Regions:
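Glycine-rich phosphate-binding loops of nucleotide-dependent enzymes
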Residues: 2-259
Length: 259
């Protein structure tokens, strides 16, 4: 995908985060283009998930700023950032295991449409219509992810790879502009990883999404991403197209040499 005609959606500017005396993220700067698939790789403990937590407002930066659609989101709370169109998945699955796949996605629709929480209690006609739309859109998302026939099954009974797909479907129910995926291929077999890669491309096109993903499976990242940033000990050591990153001596020494 050509990036020459795209505009930056997210700008990370000198982002820094200390935990006590530990410098977890060290003056990291990069821009992510609209509808780009952007990879974030590096050794364990490099600061990747911390960076996601900073972008989504789960923790505040010690220094630096975050610009999303030309507006600062640096001091916003997580729910405010979500309202602006940023959604994420987590390294550790956070599904509601006792609820069905459909219910998991519908809950996210409720969060997206806060009016439903209020008017639904009152039984207003508008609320009934909104709820019907919530279920319709949830079923559409499950269909996209190949889970429609199991919509009524409890999430805890899904295989791990299917739970990963369900979590992404739930994130999409928030109708984000920017989707952050934290190790989406973890625990998947090679066939499932290939399906996931194809699926990410599909939802990028279908929903005009921008995607940032953390992933340890290097072939998936290299084959999927438009550009890749590499972190090591909290520092950005490389940024560029996959082939450039693959051949970067600093990246080979810090990370790819272990593959």
């Amino acid at each position: 995908m050509s990036l020459s005609t795209l505009k930056p959606l997210l700008e990370v500017q000198g982002l820094t985060r200390y935990f006590g005396g530990l410098l977890a993220v060290d003056q990291v700067s990069f821009a992510v283009q609209d509808q780009e698939i952007f990879g974030l790789i590096g050794p364990n403990g490099a600061g990747k998930t911390t960076l996601f937590n900073l972008i989504t407002g789960l923790i505040p930066p010690s220094q630096g700023s975050l610009i999303y659609q030309n507006n600062s989101i640096t001091q916003l709370k997580p729910y405010q950032i979500a309202e602006k169109g940023i959604a994420r998945t987590f390294q550790n699955l956070r599904l509601f295991g006792n609820l069905s796949a459909l219910e998991n996605v519908v809950i996210a629709r409720h969060i997206h449409n806060q009016a439903n929480l209020i008017s639904g209690v009152l039984g207003l006609p508008k609320a009934v219509k909104i709820e019907q739309e919530n279920y319709q859109k949830a079923r559409q998302l499950l269909d996209i992810f190949g889970l429609a026939e199991r919509a009524e099954q409890k999430a805890r009974n899904f295989a791990y790879g299917d739970q990963r797909r369900l979590e992404i479907a739930r994130a999409l129910a928030l109708e984000p502009k920017l989707l952050l995926l934290d190790e989406p291929a973890a625990g998947m077999n090679p066939s499932e990883k290939k399906e996931l890669s194809d699926l990410i491309r599909k939802i990028r096109e279908q929903f005009q999404l921008t995607v940032i993903l953390i992933e340890h499976h290097v072939p998936l990242v290299m084959g999927l991403c438009d550009r890749i940033a590499v972190l090591d000990f909290g520092k950005l050591i490389a940024l560029g197209e996959p082939e450039m990153v693959r051949n970067n001596p600093a990246v080979i020494e810090a990370y790819l040499g272990d593959e």
